[in-house]
From Swiss-Prot:
Catalysed reactions, as listed in the record: oxaloacetate + ATP = phosphoenolpyruvate + ADP + CO2
InterPro entries given in the database record: PEP_carboxykinase_ATP, PEP_carboxykinase_C, PEP_carboxykinase_N, PEPCK_ATP_CS
A cellular component term, taken from the record's GO annotations: cytosol
Organism: Actinobacillus pleuropneumoniae serotype 5b (strain L20)
Pathway it works in: Carbohydrate biosynthesis; gluconeogenesis
Protein name per Swiss-Prot or TrEMBL: Phosphoenolpyruvate carboxykinase (ATP)
Signal peptide: none
Compartments where found: Cytoplasm
Function text: Involved in the gluconeogenesis. Catalyzes the conversion of oxaloacetate (OAA) to phosphoenolpyruvate (PEP) through direct phosphoryl transfer between the nucleoside triphosphate and OAA.
Gene3D superfamilies, sorted: 3.90.228.20, Phosphoenolpyruvate Carboxykinase, domain 1, Phosphoenolpyruvate Carboxykinase, domain 2
Catalytic EC class: lyase
Residue positions binding Mn(2+): K209, H228, D265
Family statement drawn from the similarity comment of this UniProt entry: Belongs to the phosphoenolpyruvate carboxykinase (ATP) family.
Essential cofactor(s): Mn(2+)
């Protein structure tokens, strides 16, 4: 007689399972990862911190070129499909190709000993999604146990998955050329069958970000904001969310001894307030030190899982070594961080919404207060810029415009996310701020001390009492003085020896904003927002 879970796997096409290890304990996972007979990327290595380290092979990051969504009645009118005009990662896949990939993965997982992890994506019971992850690799089960919300014994008894992830990382697709796909590897979603298939890539983040893409599909259609942001809450219950692309300071600035962390990367905002999607953190570890990021450093202990780090012969980790990848990572359960919201990672409505940008052009002010229209404009623009070296040794800024500060994970059109976010903000009486953690006319990056002073002024409300003036071209309201912030930096023009230099750079950057925003002007709502952007 097949067990309930065996029957459910058989319905998916996974048959003759030798053994099901369901929701293993951390102790069990440790024993599985340490088995001497394991080979290749299945093998775990114990480090002196107590955490296990694994390698993910040639894939040390996500593989967006291999991401597909089945084009059918459910998805065709909702998904933000890639097009010649606006490229994104949501490529259509036909039903026949999906069927053949599904058979590849279910065949790979049949006749095996499997790990089945049942978990929730979303800390709020009313909005969460029940997820089942099926894999033959112990550390992949460990990764999802760390990253998603772990159910209670009682919840497991009656667990019915809304969505299934079948991870067949050991199998590749021999027919990819005939099927018109990018490569033999695949990350495919079927929104009707509610299944994600993974093949050829071992990278753990495909499961995490795959489920984020799904939450980004389902929740906004129900009027719930879905956000690529960190979030924290003060002693008075005041919630702040921090949007920003990689490297702008999301994790650093939301980790604040005066406030409790709700989560560091993915959140929803429903009728109850802001809630974390995850039960863990997935932190970058390149050049990690206890001095610079004590919370993350101390979270790397037993039950944490390191990816693609260099482990020395004595078992210690060389965090400065990026020879495998710059994208070295660690996943750990959120309770490895001390100052968190417990027992459930959720809080009330956000009163402060902070957009972080690292402007390498040296144009934007360190902080400005946004109108509702500007909030939509800068959210849709999703701007940041990096400094990249050029041949002649000049470092020139490279702008990045990533819609909603997370274009890679958007399943619907960006204007949908802006509309839902602003509606939530209006209902909660929230205020948005644009905070530049990048550079100014001095050629130096704005100091973390000044940025923390700015964040404090936003969170304690003192920015509301400050006098403001308008910055030309961008028409942004900037404060003239804030407590514990160097007043000389608040107007970016004052950081240039020659103010005409700022003007030239500002015109250049404004032109880039205008050009980027053209893609949103195909509908009336987008056209109406142009006035909130820079004026040349």
């Amino acid at each position: 007689m097949l067990s309930r879970i065996e029957q459910e796997l058989a319905q998916l096409g996974i048959t003759n399972v030798k053994e099901i290890v369901r929701n293993p304990s951390y102790e069990q996972l440790f024993e599985e990862e340490m088995k001497p007979e394991l080979e290749g990327f299945e093998k775990g290595r114990l480090t002196t911190s107590g955490a296990v380290a694994v390698d993910t092979g040639i894939f040390t990051g996500r593989s967006p070129k291999d991401k597909y969504i089945v084009y059918d009645e459910t998805s065709k009118d909702n998904v933000w499909w890639t097009s010649d005009a606006v490229k994104n990662d949501n490529k259509p896949m036909n039903q026949a190709t999906w069927q053949s990939l599904k058979e590849l993965v279910t065949h790979q997982l049949s006749n095996k000993r499997l790990f089945v992890v049942d978990a929730f994506c979303g800390a709020n019971k009313d909005s969460r999604v029940a997820v089942r992850i099926v894999t033959e690799v112990a550390w992949q089960a460990h990764f999802v146990k760390n990253m998603f919300v772990r159910p209670s014994e009682e919840e497991l008894l009656n667990f019915v998955p809304d969505f299934v992830v079948m991870n067949g990382s050991k199998v590749t697709n021999p027919n990819w050329k005939e099927q018109g796909l990018n490569s033999e590897n695949f990350v495919a979603f079927n929104l009707t069958e509610k299944i994600q298939l993974i093949g050829g890539t071992w990278y753990g983040g495909e499961m995490k970000k795959g489920l984020f893409s799904l939450m980004n599909y389902w929740l906004p259609l129900k009027g719930i904001a879905s956000m690529h942001c960190s979030a924290n809450v003060g002693a008075e219950g005041d919630v702040a969310v921090f949007f920003g692309l990689s490297g702008t300071g999301k994790t650093t600035l939301s980790t604040d001894p005066k406030r409790k962390l709700i989560g560091d990367d993915e959140h929803g905002w429903d009728d109850d307030g802001v809630f974390n999607y995850e039960g863990g953190c997935y932190a970058k570890t390149i050049n990690l030190s206890e001095e610079n990021e004590p919370d993350i450093y101390r979270a790397i202990r037993r039950d944490a899982l390191l990816e693609n780090v260099v482990v020395r012969e004595d078992g210690s980790v060389d965090f400065a070594d990026g020879s495998k990848t710059e994208n070295t990572r660690v996943s750990y359960p959120i309770h490895h961080i001390d100052n968190i919201v417990e027992p459930v990672s959720k809080a009330g409505h956000a009163k402060k919404v902070i957009f972080l940008t690292a402007d390498a052009f040296g144009v934007l002010p360190p902080v400005s207060k946004l109108t509702p229209e500007q909030t939509k404009y800068y959210f849709l623009s999703g701007f940041t810029a990096k400094l990249a070296g050029t041949e002649r040794g000049i470092t020139e800024p490279t702008p990045t415009f990533s819609a909603c500060f997370g274009a890679a994970f958007l399943s619907l059109h960006p204007t949908k996310y802006a509309e839902v976010l602003v509606k939530r903000m209006e209902e909660a009486g929230s205020q948005a701020y644009l905070v530049n953690t990048g550079w100014n006319g001095s050629g130096k990056r704005i100091s973390i001390k000044d940025t923390r002073g700015i964040i404090d002024a936003i969170l304690d409300g003192s920015i509301e009492k400050a006098e403001t003036k308008e910055l030309p071209i961008f028409n942004l309201a900037i404060p003239t003085a804030l407590p514990n912030v160097d007043p000389a930096i608040l107007d970016p023009r004052d950081t240039y020896a020659d103010k005409a230099q700022w003007q030239t750079k500002a015109e250049d950057l404004a032109g880039r904003f205008v050009k980027n925003f053209e893609k949103y002007t195909t509908n009336d709502e987008g056209k109406a927002l142009v006035a909130a952007g820079p004026k040349l």
